Amino acid sequence: MTKTYIHGVGMTKFGNHSDRTLKSLLLDASRQALEAAGRPKIDAVFVGNFLAGSMSNQEILGAIVANDLGLGYIPTAKVEGACASGGIALRQGILGVMSGEYDTVLVAGVEKMKHANTPDVTQAINAAMDTDSNEKHAGLTFPGFFGVLAHRYFHETGATKEHLAMVALKNRENALNNPLAQFQKATSIEEIMNARLITEPLGLFDCSPMTDGAAAIVISRKPSSIHVRASALVSGPTQMQDAAELLSIPAIGESGRRAYEKAGLGPEDIDVIEIHDCFSMTEIIAIEELGFFKRLEGWKAVEAGHTKPGGKKPVNTSGGLLSRGHPIGATGLSQIYQLVHQLNGTAPNQVKGARIALAQNLGGTGSYSAVHILERL
């Protein structure tokens, strides 16, 4: 099959864009990526998005990009997979290039959430649950799900709320050096642990925020310095009670295994990682599922500093969802944006000698997981 390479990336600042429309954010990131790629002829557009219809009364995002950027009469599509929408959109673009159908594809992701009130956004996000499930009818929310996960993890290990705070603090410190991150104010373990409780044991800093923003990637069969070595997508249980065990998010582990197999690599080969840390607990589970640390020992790696920029396995050098921000449809592509800069040696919190990178993007409570492995040639 045809190989796929990354030619350009673009990203807006994440945060509150009350003065901008969803469309303007989407076009901004797309223009950046096209300029970085040298304005190539685009054969198709895929846009990752979850909430534009419900929150902004706007669909037809792919057609908007093609029309407003003058890309001509080309195939376009919006891709939805809850919080994994961006990662899934990228995979669709990659498959189009690998199949030979397209030479060059623009993949973009966007979300605008800050203009709406929290209850309305929460209600819209809950569409990423199985609405006929017992869990939904019982009133379980996403913070509630990951709070239950954290409680059980504490019970099975020596981990405490302080270890969650260590994840949140590490990601906030990383975001301080990222000019595009939503949060750039220093904090402390004490402030994190004493913050307003969202759902026991998760406090405010343990939960990803509502965010406006966009990111975009240009991929092509034409060689460049960044090779997409593997792309994997897996669907998993749509409710917690369907998983074989509570302390597992099977889709993460399976998507990781498939990506490693396709790449001919293992966790030991990865130099820098962007994880879908929608909650601090999720980062710990994900680094275990992806094989970077042993099962039920991710908290020890966090405590030892192994996931910091200078550690054994640097995780979320961008600040992650917790501090870079989480504009749902753009999140998976913002991970790629950071990792491309890491591999090019131009990233905030640069990991010395980074050559192989992994991005993991989660949807729902584990309904989707997309993993991409990138290599600097």
Language-model segments: what does each one mean?
Residues 1-23, 166, 197-258, 262, ...:
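Condensing-enzyme catalytic core mediating Claisen C-C bond formation in acyl metabolism
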Residues 41-50, 75-81, 105-109, 163-169, ...:
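Beta-strand segments within the central parallel beta-sheet cores of soluble alpha/beta enzyme folds
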Residues 1-84, 153-160, 182-188, 201, ...:
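Conserved active-site "lid/cap" helical segment
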Residues 80-111, 143-177, 217-222, 324-346:
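Active-site-proximal alpha-helical scaffold in enzymes
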Residues 7, 33, 42-45, 86, ...:
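Buried hydrophobic positions in well-ordered alpha/beta secondary-structure cores of metabolic enzymes
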Residues 249, 253, 258-280, 289, ...:
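Extended C-terminal subregions enriched in glycine
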Residues 2, 52-104, 112-117, 121-145, ...:
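Conserved catalytic cysteine-centered active-site region
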Residues 53-60, 241-244, 277-299, 327-329, ...:
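Short glycine/threonine-rich loop-to-helix capping motif typified by GTGT followed
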